[in-house]
Regions:
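Acidic, metal/ion-coordinating pockets
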Residues: 1-280, 317-323, 328-329, 388, ...
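Feature captures C-terminal
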Residues: 4-6, 16, 30, 34, ...
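Short clusters of hydrophobic/aromatic residues that line enzyme substrate/ligand-binding pockets
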Residues: 17, 303, 307, 359
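Short, flexible segments with low predicted structural confidence
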Residues: 52, 77, 301-303, 310, ...
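Intrinsic-disorder/low-complexity loop/linker signature
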Residues: 122, 201, 304-305, 310, ...
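Short, surface-exposed secondary-structure junctions/capping segments
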Residues: 283-287
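Acidic, glycine-rich low-complexity/disordered segments
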Residues: 289-298
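Glycine-rich phosphate/diphosphate-binding loops and the adjacent beta-loop-alpha structural elements
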Residues: 298-319
Length: 506
C-alpha cells in the first residue's frame, strides 16, 4: 500500500533455526527459517526488520556450538545475517556465554546493534538512537535492555559493562529525539516486559526494575510503538497512546506493525510461524545441524532408576528422582552439605539409557554451580520463599498462578537434598515449613551449611535475596550439562537409591 510503513520484529528467538523439537524431533512451528519465510512475504521497500534480543542462548544447536566450536561465528548469528535485519537490540541471555561470544555475534549479525543503555569500557555501547527515512517519513528508533542483568549474570561476563536504568534511559532518549529530530514516529525496542496487568494496571510482580514496560507506556509520552520481549507473551495492542507488541519465544511468532501516515493509524498484530520453512536457510546449516543431532544421540551411560518426567506437576509435588540425581551430582562434585535444583519447564528427564539429548532437554540453561554458606535461619527463609510456589484452590494443592503468568517461572521452585522438610501449603506465606531436619536433628537458626546451587539462584535470581547476600564459598565454571555428562561417563552405570525427603501437604 502506498505510504504504508511496516515494522517486522522478532524477539527471544533463543537460538532456534530449525522447525523441530530437540527433545523428540517432532515438527514445530518455530525457528528463524520459518520467520524468514514470513519476512520474505511481508517485506517491501517500506519495511524495517528488527530483532529485540535473546538470540544466542536456548537451543541445543547453540549449546553444541559454544561447547564444540566457540571460536567460529555461531549458526544463529549467520542466520540473522541471512535474514538481513535492519537493527538489533540485545537481551539478557545474550550475555550468557561471555563478552567475546557477544561481541563476535554483534560484529557478524549483519545489522547495527542500537542498545543504548549499557556502557562498554566506559563508553555508550550503541547510539542514543538512529534515524531512518521510510516512505517519506522520518522515523527514530532506539533500543534498551533490562538493567537487571547484573542480578543474574556471571560477573566475568559483564566485567567491562555498566547498565543504566531502562526507564530513565528511555525517558531521556525520547526527550532528546523530540528536541533534536522532531520525527514523525518514535519506535522503542525494549528487551523487557510488563510489570503490571495491561487491562487493570495491577502489579503482577515485585517492582524490581526487571520489567518496566507498563511504566514506560504510562509515563513516557511520544513513543508511538514499543516492541517488548523477555516474558515470551503474545501481546499486541494500545495503551496510553502507545502501541505495543510482544512475541512468544523460539521464533514461534513475528510482530507486524503497519503504520498508515495518511490517516494516522497504526495496526499491530502477531503472526504465527505456521508456514513452510525457508529452504535456503535450512540448507545453510545442514552440516551444523547434522553434527549436533549426532552429538545429541550419544549414549553416555545407564541408570538403575527410570528418571523420565511424565507429569511435571507431580514431579514437583513429589520431587522427581531426576532432581535427586541432579542434586547428588552437585553434592559429590562440590562436597556441599546440601544441594538444590529446579525442574525446568518441559524437562524430559532420562530413561535407563542416558543420552546427551536427555541432558540438554532436562537441563536447558547454561548455568554453572556455585556453593554458598548459609545459616539455618537463611535456609528456612529460602525454603519459605520456594514454598510460595504452591497454594490451595478448591481444597486442592495447585501451582500459584503468579508462577504461570505473566511468564512461566517454574524454574523458581527449588527442591533441596541433604535435609528433610515438610511444606504445609494451607499455612500463611512465610510459615509453611512445619518440619525441617538435618541428619535427623531439627535445624536451628545458628547451624551452618554449605549448599550447591546454580549461578542464577546464587545471585538472587527469582527474588531470592537471602541467597544473594550469603557468602560464596566456590564457583565451578563448568556448565551443569558438562558436569552431568562427565559424571555419567565416569560412572557409566548410575546406581542410587531414591530419596523422598520433601513432603508437601495441604
Amino acid at each position: 500500500m502506498t505510504g504504508r510503513i511496516r515494522i517486522l520484529a522478532t524477539s527471544d528467538v533463543h537460538g532456534y533455526i530449525y522447525p523441530h523439537s530437540y527433545a523428540d524431533s517432532s515438527s514445530k512451528d518455530i525457528g528463524l527459517a520459518k520467520i524468514k519465510s514470513l519476512v520474505n512475504i511481508l517485506r517491501d521497500e517500506n519495511t524495517l526488520v528488527l530483532d529485540n534480543g535473546d538470540v544466542l542462548e536456548g537451543s541445543p544447536l547453540m549449546y553444541h556450538h559454544f561447547v564444540k566450536t566457540p571460536d567460529e561465528v555461531s549458526p544463529i548469528t549467520r542466520a540473522m545475517a541471512d535474514l538481513n535485519y535492519d537493527y538489533i537490540n540485545v537481551g539478557n541471555h545474550d550475555f550468557n556465554y561471555g563478552e567475546e561470544a557477544l561481541m563476535m555475534h554483534l560484529q557478524n549479525a549483519g545489522a547495527p546493534c542500537i542498545t543504548s543503555n549499557f556502557f562498554y569500557h566506559g563508553k555508550p555501547f550503541g547510539p542514543n538512537y538512529v534515524i531512518r527515512q521510510v516512505a517519506g517519513k522520518k522515523i527514530a528508533i532506539f533500543g534498551i535492555v533490562t538493567q537487571y542483568i547484573p542480578n543474574w549474570e556471571k560477573k566475568s561476563h559483564i566485567k567491562h559493562m555498566r547498565f543504566v536504568d531502562a526507564y530513565l534511559s528511555a525517558e531521556a532518549t525520547v526527550k532528546l529525539i523530540k528536541r533534536l529530530e522532531n520525527p514523525d514516529y518514535i519506535i522503542c525496542m525494549y528487551h523487557g516486559g510488563f510489570e503490571r496487568d495491561l487491562v487493570n494496571g495491577r502489579l503482577t510482580e515485585d517492582e524490581t526494575g526487571e520489567n518496566e514496560g507498563y511504566k514506560i507506556l504510562r509515563n513516557i509520552r511520544g513513543i508511538d510503538v514499543m516492541i517488548s520481549g523477555h516474558q515470551h507473551r503474545t501481546e499486541a495492542g494500545k495503551l496510553y497512546d502507545t502501541y505495543y507488541t510482544q512475541t512468544a519465544a523460539n521464533g514461534a511468532e513475528l510482530a507486524c506493525i503497519d503504520i498508515y501516515p495518511d490517516n494516522n493509524t497504526i495496526e499491530p498484530r502477531i503472526l504465527k510461524a505456521d508456514i513452510d520453512a525457508d529452504p535456503e536457510m535450512l540448507k545453510l546449516f545442514e552440516r551444523e545441524e547434522a553434527t549436533c543431532q549426532a552429538w545429541l544421540d550419544q549414549t553416555l551411560g545407564t541408570t538403575n532408576v527410570d528418571l523420565r518426567v511424565t507429569d511435571e506437576f507431580d514431579a514437583r509435588l513429589h520431587k522427581s528422582q531426576v532432581i535427586t540425581f541432579l542434586n547428588k551430582v552437585q553434592q559429590e562434585k562440590t562436597g556441599a552439605d546440601l544441594s538444590s535444583n529446579a525442574l525446568f519447564l518441559g524437562a524430559t528427564g532420562f530413561g535407563r539409557d542416558i543420552t546427551m539429548r536427555d541432558l540438554v532437554s532436562t537441563y536447558v540453561y547454561p548455568n554453572t554451580t556455585v556453593v554458598k554458606k548459609i545459616t539455618g535461619k537463611i535456609l528456612r527463609e529460602y525454603l519459605e520463599k520456594t514454598a510460595e510456589f504452591w497454594m490451595i484452590h478448591n481444597e486442592h494443592i495447585v501451582v500459584n498462578p503468579s508462577y504461570d503468568w505473566p511468564k512461566p517461572q517454574h524454574y523458581n521452585y527449588d527442591m533441596v537434598d541433604g535435609i528433610e522438610y515438610t511444606i504445609k501449603v494451607s499455612n500463611p506465606v512465610g510459615h509453611r515449613i512445619t518440619s525441617l531436619t538435618y541428619q535427623g536433628n531439627d535445624v536451628t537458626d545458628d547451624m551452618e551449611f554449605t549448599i550447591a546451587m546454580n549461578n542464577y539462584r546464587a545471585t538472587g535470581g527469582g527474588n531470592y535475596n537471602m541467597i544473594k547476600e550469603a557468602p560464596t564459598i566456590s564457583t565451578d565454571l563448568s556448565s551443569m550439562v558438562e558436569l552431568l555428562a562427565n559424571y555419567i561417563q565416569e560412572h557409566k552405570v548410575i546406581d542410587f537409591e531414591p530419596v523422598n525427603n520433601i513432603t508437601v501437604i495441604k
